[in-house]
């Protein structure tokens, strides 16, 4: 990435083009893991299990990346996968499994995002990878950080403090609103971010 940024800046400066460099964080996200065949088909009405156990995904179950998810959900919660293309309702919970009824079926493939609307999930905003990426961004003197999956003003404040600590006071934060919690907290996020995406 360093070479790409340096090349971009050389071309920008040579041609006197006003263009900025933005670093996009991964953000706090939950994803499904892998299916045996890379994908499967889910039908409305069927039972499907999201599990913290390491399993090879089938049309009956798949592993998820966030181990504490079962303990933070309740029966009746809705779960959206792949930007809402697949929807489910939680019907039962164990220490490792989230048993769901598929509401909206379709094809589902490896590494799709998992979203739980109206449920505050208690996990840290900045991952270890995000921290490494932000330090790199400060070293490369990026102009903006696109902060993925911002849920509240606290997420923006956490990034601001982190950037400031490493000398990135000038870096502007663009909050990416990508879930229901972010929508619900839109006004407070807007007051603390330099922009919204």
Q: What does each of the following model-derived ranges do?
A:
Residues 1-197:
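Non-catalytic helical/linker scaffolds that mediate oligomerization, partner binding
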